Amino acid sequence: MRLRFTKMHGLGNDFVMIDAISQKVTITPERARKLADRHFGVGCDQVLVVESPDNPDADFRYRIFNNDGSEVENCGNGARCFAVFVRQRQLTAKSDIVVETAAGLLRLHVLDDNQVTVNMGVPVLAPAQIPFVTPHEQPEYPLQLDNMEITISAVSMGNPHAVTLVDNLASFPVKTLGAQIETHAQFPNRVNAGFMELISRQEVKLRVFERGVGETLACGTGACAAVVSGIVRGLLDTTVAVHLPGGSLSITWEGAEKPVMMTGPAKAVFHGQVKL
């Protein structure tokens, strides 16, 4: 069969979008891996699938496959693309969209110029729920890598994140240390590794080594986790501009039991068909 798809990106974090409602298709991990292959497939960081929801409170089900075929709980940049995609495909005319994910419900609000605000939910700091193996919850934790010890914060935004403060982000060995953090034994489900440089209380730079993907141009959940970690440490204000290699996001968090709000762009690049 021929599969219709749309290529989209959120700040360079790129996606193959699949409408599995108007075309009957099942995306398996193997199919996702082939679609995501940049040499032999379409090529992307993640494959995002629109399905009919099981939850009656949701408009759609939102599934996320990394380019290694693994299915994950959440993707913030993908959520913005998802909201724009379902409107462009005329699957809905709503500007407020509720989607069902493996991590729960996400609420998306489409603004002008394809800017989207995503209610990313309340961040989780309890180690057992991230999951992160440690005796007690703390703002910071030591983490022993191959040849050094670093300090991290551990946050779940529906998916696990370890955030490290660095002095010079441009020269920091993100790929080397990111790979060690991703597969660290204290994170039983692996982890996304974020590296944050503070500019001011309202502005940071961030690079993210994503679980199952590697370093990407942008990571929405990573930006949220980084801001939460900075606020918990007393280093950041409630609204922060996060500058990623692919562009900038605005992240707001008003503290414990409050949801994190993320605003940023989503853009369609091209439409196509591929033989499965």
From Swiss-Prot:
Chain sites annotated for binding substrate: N13, Q46, N66, G76, N77, N159, N192, E210, R211, G220, T221
Main location group: cytoplasm
GO CC field: cytosol
GO MF terms, alphabetically ordered: diaminopimelate epimerase activity
Subunit structure: Homodimer.
Site residues, Could be important to modulate the pK values of the two catalytic cysteine residues: H161, E210
Recorded family membership: Belongs to the diaminopimelate epimerase family.
Record organism: Teredinibacter turnerae (strain ATCC 39867 / T7901)
Protein name: Diaminopimelate epimerase
InterPro entries reported in the protein's UniProt record: DAP_epimerase_AS, DAP_epimerase_DapF
Gene, per the UniProt record: dapF
Ribosomal protein in keyword set: no
Known pathway: Amino-acid biosynthesis; L-lysine biosynthesis via DAP pathway; DL-2,6-diaminopimelate from LL-2,6-diaminopimelate: step 1/1
Active site feature: C75 (proton donor), C219 (proton acceptor)
GO biological process: lysine biosynthetic process via diaminopimelate
